[in-house]
Amino acid sequence: MSNEVTIYFDRPMSFEPNNIQPLNGITGLYFIFSQTIDIQYPFDKSKLLYIGMSERKTNSIGSRLLGHFDGKSKNLGLTNYRKVEPLLFTYINFEMLKNIWQFRIEDLESYFILDFVEQYGVYPICNNKSGFEIQNKTLTSSFKIDWKYFK
């Protein structure tokens, strides 16, 4: 592992269409989380509900988030948490990491999910997939992820 980069998240945004629309055409990772509900994971509490990604500009962060917002993604967990309280989101533009991450966005998502599992003991509560793909890669970068952001 040659270089460690600390990942800090941008300010939280309200999970609503007027904040989602400007993200059309942007690829990367996005994080949906609660404003006040602490999820008790095995190792610690977090407000993080979901880690997602967009790998193509035609299926951008904006369109993926809109799919979660209007229920088209069929993620019942996110839909039901949103019924209880307004949610927040933040994102990482993949363009910002291209110089230090040599693999696909899918692998970056797997890295983040597996790192969350290591810190909290299980996948984010609304994620339904695993992140095993990255385990077969030889990594030249590692990320120290600021999971405290979601506390």
Predicted features and spans:
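Boundary/linker segments flanking structured domains
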Residues: M1-K151
